[in-house]
């Protein structure tokens, strides 16, 4: 599925703005999609609906379907064209109707979907567009939610007390996310109508090599001849070819590299009959060789942030202003990488990372697969088919981005209690990712802090990615013990002869809280936490990177472990740096992107 663009052959019409909105229930067909919503209120699109009306807690605590509606008029300029309705994402399950006719259904809240509406939406006519989205998470969704009778992530309970058990039985149904971020929902990313000619370019795949050879494949719906031209960054034609697939050689090729290098971008300009499409790409290689990760043949060190799509008022909604600000803060911090924890981000963010030279670890929404020794998720959770779907959709969407250098299959599953079942679940996904990616990028799985000696899955990934909280959740506040424990584990990973990196580590830090002795939750402790652990990373030549948790404070489910959200951000939620960020900024300024451990 190509990203919609406007050019001489295609028209793109935004449907973003203020829509009509109504909360539903758990009944999927509660409202008639062919009629105006009853008692509708205004809602902004794209954005989460949860925090847009503080006059009531109903939106914040909603459980079930929510309904959106607006009128759509197609311009007469679109006459004779194919017309497509596209959603960047709707969280988590979506049904879409046009004039009461069901035109699309999609499960998965972080990837795009679309419907051909040429036969239903005619130029000069107005139609009623209705969208219903279901925010419920359970054992069949990604991310995973807990079922009735179970706790939310970091929830608390005095199980067995009669009054507590009675209150639980009497309580209204609610989401119990098995993940540590707020379950925002709604139409989160842009909604557009776009047109193409009747015969059109359907898909483009670009596989560049550092010698300047570019393999390409163009999928079309008709028989018109295909012509491709490579344009340099100034728009000059440097190579061309005929045919729907083949190879082009770029003379004196410029490579794409992360900042402070040059993230040089080319454009593959494609014509097919009346249709035209431009696909940007960068020429770079990424591979694992021994215990090193090589980008363009040079040993790479990741200096990165884990992030969330999260901000006040619009929740997880697409925000181009915030994306630009965050990218500039990443540059300011002297970082070079982002992990899209814990789901694929908006497509426009990857475009920015391509342009600005920021490396991306691209992650599926597979978080929360595990519940301790009592539950075997690989036998009891019906997830495998949906997991394959979201993995395939992510790779298909992001395959041409030079910024994407690593696929993450998921976050912190249970790999300890049912090790063989875990391997049997995850290894086929690892193989599938390699099969689906035409550039064959490295593939990983981010593992949590459990008994790593029983984990037989992580060690089989291309890069070992470990989430560890020595000094915070384990050996809390004792950084001497934390460093000892970390080194005990790193000795184990050294024996696996793989590149290893810390994909998540951090300490909750209340902005403005200061202590003389670097006590937990203070800004001083955040500095000490990173200073001590980072020094241990630097001693290991096979340790290839660090992704701090988190870029900024973010919202979570209520619970006794969270006071107004997760405070592990190096920036506050409104993007003010804490002391720990100033420490990391200096550290990362002294670490080169290439050749740090040679």
Walk through the language-model features, giving the residues of each.
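Secreted/periplasmic carbohydrate-active enzymes, especially glycoside hydrolases
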Residues: 1-347, 352, 356-360, 390, ...
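Substrate-binding clefts and catalytic carboxylate motifs of secreted carbohydrate-active enzymes
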Residues: 7-31, 171-172, 179-186, 193, ...
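Feature marks short, surface-exposed loop/turn motifs that line or immediately flank catalytic pockets
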Residues: 91, 135-137, 287, 308-309, ...
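Short hydrophobic/aromatic-enriched beta-strand-loop microsegments
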Residues: 106, 357-364, 462-468
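The substrate-binding groove and active-site-proximal loops of carbohydrate-active enzymes
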Residues: 109, 176, 180, 308-321, ...
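Catalytic metal-binding/acid-base residues of hydrolase active sites
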Residues: 134-136, 343, 365, 410-414, ...
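Short low-complexity, flexible loop/linker segments enriched in glycine and/or proline
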Residues: 145-146, 352-356, 375-380, 384-387, ...
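Proline-centered loop/turn at the N-terminus of a beta-strand
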Residues: 357-359, 365, 440-442, 499
């Amino acid at each position: 599925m190509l990203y919609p663009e406007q050019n001489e052959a295609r028209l793109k019409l935004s449907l973003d703005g203020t829509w009509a909105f109504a909360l539903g229930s758990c009944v999927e067909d509660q409202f008639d999609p062919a009629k105006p919503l009853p008692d509708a209120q205004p809602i902004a699109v794209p954005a989460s609906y949860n925090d847009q009306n503080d006059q009531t807690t109903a939106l914040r605590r909603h459980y079930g379907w929510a309904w959106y509606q607006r009128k759509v008029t197609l311009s007469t300029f679109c006459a004779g064209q194919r017309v497509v309705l596209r959603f960047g994402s709707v969280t988590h399950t979506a049904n879409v109707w046009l004039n009461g006719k069901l035109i699309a259904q999609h499960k998965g809240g972080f990837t795009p979907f679309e419907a051909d509406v040429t036969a239903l939406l005619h130029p000069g006519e107005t139609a009623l567009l209705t969208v219903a989205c279901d925010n419920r998470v359970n054992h069949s969704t990604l991310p995973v939610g807990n079922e009735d009778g179970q706790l939310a992530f970091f929830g608390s309970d005095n199980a067995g007390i009669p009054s507590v058990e009675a209150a639980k039985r009497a309580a209204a149904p609610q989401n119990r996310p098995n993940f540590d971020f707020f379950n925002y929902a709604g139409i989160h990313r842009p909604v557009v109508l776009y047109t193409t000619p009747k015969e059109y370019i359907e898909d483009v795949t670009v596989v560049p090599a550092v010698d300047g050879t570019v393999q390409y494949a163009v999928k079309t719906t008709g028989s018109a001849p295909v012509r491709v031209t490579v344009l340099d960054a100034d728009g000059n034609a440097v190579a061309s070819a005929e045919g729907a697939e083949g190879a082009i050689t770029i003379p004196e090729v410029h490579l794409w590299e992360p900042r402070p290098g040059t993230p040089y971008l080319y454009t593959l300009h494609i014509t097919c009959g009346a249709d035209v499409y431009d696909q940007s790409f960068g020429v770079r290689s990424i591979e694992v060789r021994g215990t090193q990760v090589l980008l363009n043949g040079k040993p790479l060190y990741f200096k990165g942030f884990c992030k969330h799509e999260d901000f006040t008022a619009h929740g997880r909604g697409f925000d181009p202003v915030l994306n630009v600000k965050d990218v500039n803060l990443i540059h300011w911090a002297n970082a070079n990488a982002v992990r899209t924890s814990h789901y694929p981000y908006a497509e426009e963010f990857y475009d920015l990372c391509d342009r600005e030279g920021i490396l991306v670890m691209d992650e599926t929404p597979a978080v929360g697969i595990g519940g301790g020794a009592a539950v075997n998720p690989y036998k009891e959770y019906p997830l495998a088919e949906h997991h394959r779907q979201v993995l395939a959709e992510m790779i298909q969407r992001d395959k041409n981005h030079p910024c994407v250098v690593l696929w993450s299959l998921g976050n912190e599953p249970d790999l300890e209690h049912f090790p063989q079942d875990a391997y049997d679940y995850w290894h086929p996904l690892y193989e599938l990712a390699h099969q689906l990616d035409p550039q064959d990028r490295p593939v990983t799985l981010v593992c949590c802090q459990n008994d790593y000696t029983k984990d037989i899955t992580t060690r089989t990934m291309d890069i070992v990615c470990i989430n560890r909280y020595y000094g915070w959740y384990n050996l809390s506040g004792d950084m001497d013990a934390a460093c000892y424990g970390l080194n005990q584990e790193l000795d184990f990973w050294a024996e696996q002869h793989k590149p290893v990196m810390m994909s998540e580590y951090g300490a909750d830090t209340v902005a403005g809280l200061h202590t003389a002795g670097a006590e937990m939750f203070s800004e001083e402790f955040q500095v000490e936490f990173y200073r001590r652990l980072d020094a241990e990373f630097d001693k290991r030549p096979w340790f290839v990177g660090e992704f701090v948790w988190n870029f900024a404070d973010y919202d979570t489910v209520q619970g006794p472990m969270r006071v107004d959200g997760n405070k592990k951000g190096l920036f506050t939620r409104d993007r003010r740096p804490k002391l720990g960020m100033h420490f990391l900024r200096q550290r990362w300024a002294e670490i080169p992107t290439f050749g740090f451990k040679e």
